[in-house]
Amino acid sequence: MEFKHVPILLNECIENLNIRDGKIYVDCTVGGAGHSREIAKRIGNGKLICFDQDEDALKVAKQRLEEFGDKIIFIKDNFKNIKNDLHNLGIEKVDGILMDIGVSSYQIDEDSRGFSYMHDADLDMRMDQSNPISAKDIVNTYSKEDLENVIFKYSDEKWAKRIAEFICNARETKPINTTFELVEVIEKAIPKKVRMNQKGHSAKKTFQAIRIEVNKELDVLEQAVGDSIDLLNPEGRICIITFHSLEDKICKDIFRQRQKGCICPPEIPVCVCNHKPEIKIITRKPIEPSKEELEQNSRARSAKLRVAEKII
């Protein structure tokens, strides 16, 4: 299958990265290399470090960026390890970092990856195929309480308790091995009247929650955003595209925390901490896709871009 992934908010990312000749940039999720290609065109004799934990994505990215030669360094790893991986390359500071969070169009559309409730496939959902834990493991081994917690926490699915109960009941008869088997259980758990009137697919929220749990996406994001800010040179920028409220909240909260000056307790009348703001937030409100982009790519509809600049 052809690796298709249309870069979202491409112009907005390139503009806000403030790319300069000869500097070092990082694409934490190279995917189909749409963003990386535009960055590489603008760095002159600089360097671009491209991360991805998905072997398929890296193969495609290497082909699509081949013309840029040794300007590009590829790293097969989860971007939560950005600080250590760059250190191993002898790089302690960089000038811009891009994160495009979440699952790629290729991963959704490739049946064998098991991300989609629209294609029947083995229940997988691993972004990194070397990850020992798949969606099948979670669905068939987590307790009812743990399943309910995962589904509600990561998707705000109000039928989480009932879905967890139905999953546990179904797997007593036989394991739930495929995406369509899981969809069938979810649809039985949600009352028909509700399903008939709700927007979107009945399984969408549960699949999102399980995918986040499989890949520990929110833990990874929290670690990576904090470390990325540490890695930036003064005037370096971090651009983060998120696709749901949990991701966006993590980024917003970390940006606000790192923008703070004094962190003394309120009862202390005079600052003694000497804490200085580390960043300034460039996007007071997140940038969202234009009407024109949404007409061309409906998968961009929930995207939000937040940008911050290192000041010390």
Curated annotation (Swiss-Prot):
Its EC number is 2.1.1.199. Its main location: cytoplasm. The keyword Transferase applies. S-adenosyl-L-methionine binds at A33, G34, H35, D52, F79, D100, Q107. Keywords: Cytoplasm, Methyltransferase, rRNA processing, S-adenosyl-L-methionine, Transferase. It comes from Finegoldia magna (strain ATCC 29328 / DSM 20472 / WAL 2508). GO terms for cellular component: cytoplasm. The keyword Zinc does not apply. It is found in: Cytoplasm. This is Ribosomal RNA small subunit methyltransferase H. One of its GO terms (molecular function) is rRNA (cytosine-N4-)-methyltransferase activity. GO terms for biological process: rRNA base methylation. HAMAP family: 16SrRNA_methyltr_H. Specifically methylates the N4 position of cytidine in position 1402 (C1402) of 16S rRNA. InterPro entries: RsmH (IPR002903), SAM-dep_MeTrfase_MraW_recog (IPR023397), SAM-dependent_MTases_sf (IPR029063). Belongs to the methyltransferase superfamily. RsmH family. It catalyses: cytidine(1402) in 16S rRNA + S-adenosyl-L-methionine = N(4)-methylcytidine(1402) in 16S rRNA + S-adenosyl-L-homocysteine + H(+).
